[in-house]
Amino acid sequence: MSLVVRPMRDDESRSFLEIQRAAVRGLAAKDYPASVIDAWAPLPVTDTAVAFFRVNHDSEIRLVAELDGELVGIGALVLAESELRACYVVPDAARRGVGSALVAEIERLARHHRLTHLELLSSLTAEPFYRALDYEVEERVEHVLGSGGRMPAVKMRKTLHQGAALGG
């Protein structure tokens, strides 16, 4: 098994969104009603959605994960907000170390940029994953989706310790 985490290329915007939607629909559907899933991960991925996604590209460091040459995961870091913005893995690659590798690279980048902590808004589905990576629950909240719908979510935080991860 060959796992590579790398910066997203400009021509991978649609794939980034498709992975997010596949992860939400395949993994989070057990924890949320269909109305939330449809608002959170609308299909198909439209040209308008891709264009909107590209507008925000300067504010995020976006990563992709390749497993044996196939894109299977995505991640995003917003330095200005010390926020782990996204970590999604397609269902077929779940529980194979892809998400952990994405978070490790996001944390490495955050340390490199001298961030002292990371915050995130987790789905109910991903909360145990982040807990296993030493993120702590700050509070349970209702996240307002772009459609105006609401979904239960978990605000989490992790203190980052500077060290060997400061390289490259």
Predicted feature descriptions by range:
Residues 130, 135:
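Conserved active-site tyrosine of GNAT-family acetyltransferases
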Residues 2-4:
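Extreme N-terminal starter segment of soluble prokaryotic enzymes
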Residues 149-168:
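Terminal substrate-recognition subdomain of acyl/acetyltransferases
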